[in-house]
Amino acid sequence: MESKTVLVTGSSRGIGRACALAFAGAGYHVFINCRTSTDKLETLEQEILSAGGACTKLPGDVSNPETVSSIFREITASRGGLDILVNNAGIAHFGLLSDMTDEEWRTVLDTNLSSAFYCCREAIPHMVSKKQGRIINISSIWGTSGASCEAAYSASKAGLDGLTRALAKELAPSNIQVNAIACGVIDTEMNGRLDREERAALEDEIPAGRFGTAEEAAGLVLMLAEAPSYLTGQVIGMDGGFL
C-alpha cells in the first residue's frame, strides 16, 4: 500500500521541521519546503532519508502563487497529489504599527496568510476528486487575543483562523477536514529575540510554567492528520493554559 503524502511549508526549522520528522516517522512521504534556509532543508531531507523515511525537498517562496503552482506540479508528477497539507510557513515582525512600512505589512500577511490560500487552492482539487484530505493550519494565540507590537502577525493569524473555519464548512461535504492549531509560546528561533529576563517574565505568565516545544506542536499536528473525520473547523489552543 502506497504511503500517504504530506506537504509541510516552512519546514527547515522549528515547528515545521518537527512536523516533517513526525510525519516521516509515521510512514508518510513528506514534501518539505522553505524559502531561504535551503542548507537546513537539505540536512532535514538527509536526516529523514537516512532513517529510512520518504522525503522530497521542494524549496521556494510559498507567498508567490507562481512558485506554489510549480511546487504542486512537482507533487502531482511524482505522487499524484496530497493527502495532507500543513500550512506552517510564517514570519514575525515586532514593532509599533505606526513604524511599519507597506512592504513589511505585506510581507507578513503574504507569508502567513496568502501562502495558505495559495497552497489550499492548489491542494483542494485533488482532495475533492478523492473525497478525502486534511488541511492543518499553524496559527497562534495572538490571532485570538492580539499581541502588542505584533499587529501584523496577530492580524495574519486571525485571518488564518477565519480561513480555517470558513474552508472547513466549504469542504466538509467533500470529506475534507480543515483545522488549525493556535500555538502559544513555543521554544523556537522565532522567539529567539527574547532575552533571559523577558523569557522568565513570559514563563511566569504561562500556567504550565514553561514554553512549549516544537515536538509537542508536531505531535498535535500528526494527531489532527489522523483524527476522526467529524473533527473539522476547529482552532485548537496549545498554549500551556495561557488563554
Predicted region positions:
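Alpha-helical segment proximal to the catalytic Tyr-Lys
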Residues: P125, K169-P173
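Conserved glycine-rich cofactor-binding loop
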Residues: S12-R13
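Residue(s) in the substrate-gating loop at a strand-loop-helix junction
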Residues: S140
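Active-site helix of classical SDR
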Residues: C120, S156, T164
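Substrate-binding pocket helix/loop in short-chain dehydrogenase/reductase
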Residues: L96-L97, E104-L109, E198, L202
